[in-house]
């Protein structure tokens, strides 16, 4: 498996090549074939968002407010025979896309223990060809255009929405002429925005309402942190209203809630469940298709499924837990239980088979989705906040590993033969001495 990870401490991308069974925490276990560092720009410019446009074409959004267009290719490694390594070139960039001053007035109201910092919460394609949405925590929505011929990245428009934002999830379950995306954050209710086909206008088309007060008649705090879309309700279903918007989506919150929304049903969630006992904050949301249909998951992680009861999802808390639930909010199991020792800052799903995890304990891990067994564990020496699989390459790596193992076995066998030959010579000498 060839993997690319965004590393916070030095602002680099690290490329790792390894086979299943790799574990750098065990000396006798197989080790990575390659760990290579690329595009190192320092802590203040670490990569926050990565979007793969096509093979060898990338957009990177960095913590210093820069978005880069990067091209890559596989070349022969200069030192390891038979090994390929990626070569990255920054061919276009645009700077100055953050504005932390828009967050200053929110710091006094925030429940966070640290000061709010601006950064990118989303980087995704929109309906207009070769245009991309880059959203920031401070509520800036940038529309970027990429000219592949001239390798030029430009900013077309900037819109402002209410801050702070934890996410900006683009709807890609169906093809639409206009781009719809959802956003929200701390004390910022989920809103749906529509971007015009020409990307020159933006309008809010729907806003959620908070749930009713709890059993003590206390207001339930608002803090959506992640959202994923589902397929809309069929137009043939009972109660369908053509005059209402038709979107379904799932939300997890910073107060441990899991919400299921249907805009046909109303502005409040259809279900709003507590997942953790003491309202511990949740951070991320990744959807699974129970039928393991890879085509059911879109490029942006949304799910082409109408039924919420049959789906499964994975989320993380702000400690060390990576948790798998079903659509009813029932815990199925945990990944890396007892092994993950730091906050999981990133989880991602590859091909509906593997869960990629990285975090503050500086390890990149790969788990089997179904069995939750750990398939690989690689120490990268830095905090990790994004992971992408470039290609699996399992067969080649297994052949390399088998060749190494055969070589070790052959060496061990040769050593045993040499030892036996030496002992037989010594025994022969002893017998000759006795005869004399």
From Swiss-Prot:
Any one of the GO BP annotations: ribosomal large subunit biogenesis
UniProt subcellular location: Nucleus, Nucleolus
SUPFAM superfamilies (UniProt xref): WD40 repeat-like
Keywords tagged on the record: Nucleus, Ribosome biogenesis, rRNA processing
Keyword Nucleus: yes
Family annotation (InterPro entries): WD40_repeat_dom_sf, WDR74/Nsa1
Region (Disordered): 405-436
Entry keyword Nucleus: yes
Domain of life: Eukaryota
GO CC annotations on file: nucleolus; preribosome, large subunit precursor
Family: Belongs to the NSA1 family.
Role this protein plays: Involved in the biogenesis of the 60S ribosomal subunit.
Quaternary structure annotation from Swiss-Prot or TrEMBL: Component of the pre-66S ribosomal particle.
PANTHER family for this protein: NOP SEVEN ASSOCIATED PROTEIN 1, WD REPEAT-CONTAINING PROTEIN 74
Name of this chain's protein: Ribosome biogenesis protein NSA1
């Amino acid at each position: 498996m060839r993997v690319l990870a965004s590393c916070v401490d030095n602002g680099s991308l690290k490329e790792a090549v390894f086979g299943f069974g790799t574990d750098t925490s065990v000396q006798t276990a197989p080790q990575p074939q390659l760990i290579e560092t690329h595009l190192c720009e320092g802590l203040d410019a670490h990569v926050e968002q990565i979007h793969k446009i096509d093979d060898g074409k990338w957009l990177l959004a960095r913590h210093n407010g820069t978005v880069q267009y990067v091209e890559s290719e596989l070349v022969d490694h200069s030192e390891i025979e038979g090994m390929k390594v990626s070569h990255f070139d920054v061919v276009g960039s645009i700077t100055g896309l953050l504005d932390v001053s828009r967050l200053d007035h929110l710091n006094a109201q925030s429940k966070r223990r640290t000061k709010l910092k601006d950064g990118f919460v989303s980087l995704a394609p929109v309906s207009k060809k070769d245009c991309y949405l880059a959203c920031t925590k401070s509520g800036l929505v940038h529309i970027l255009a990429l000219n592949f011929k001239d390798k030029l990245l430009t900013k077309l428009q900037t819109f402002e929405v209410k801050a702070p934002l934890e996410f900006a999830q683009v709807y890609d379950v169906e093809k639409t002429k206009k781009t719809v995306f959802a956003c929200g954050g701390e004390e910022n209710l989920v809103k749906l925005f529509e971007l015009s086909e020409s990307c020159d206008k933006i309008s809010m088309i729907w806003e959620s309402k908070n749930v009713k007060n709890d059993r003590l008649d206390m207001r339930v705090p608002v803090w959506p942190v992640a959202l994923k879309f589902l397929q809309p309700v069929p137009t043939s279903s009972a109660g369908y209203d053509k005059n209402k918007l038709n979107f379904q989506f799932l939300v997890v919150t910073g107060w441990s809630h899991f919400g299921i929304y249907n805009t046909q049903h109303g502005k409040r969630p259809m279900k709003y469940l507590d997942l953790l006992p003491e309202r511990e904050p949740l951070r991320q949301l990744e959807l699974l298709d129970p039928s393991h249909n890879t085509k059911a998951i879109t490029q942006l992680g949304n799910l082409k499924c109408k039924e919420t009861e049959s789906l499964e999802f994975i989320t993380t808390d702000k400690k060390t837990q990576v948790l798998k639930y079903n659509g009813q909010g029932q815990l199925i199991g945990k990944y890396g239980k007892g092994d993950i020792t730091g906050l999981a800052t990133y989880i991602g799903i590859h091909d509906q088979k593997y869960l990629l995890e990285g975090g503050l304990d500086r390890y990149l891990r790969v788990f089997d989705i179904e069995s939750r067994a750990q398939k690989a564990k690689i120490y990268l020496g830095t905090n990790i906040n994004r992971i992408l699989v470039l290609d699996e390459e399992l067969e080649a790596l297994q052949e390399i590993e088998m060749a190494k193992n055969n070589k070790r076995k052959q060496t061990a066998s040769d050593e045993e033969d040499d030892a036996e030959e030496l002992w037989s010579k010594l025994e022969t000498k002893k017998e000759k001495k006795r005869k004399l």
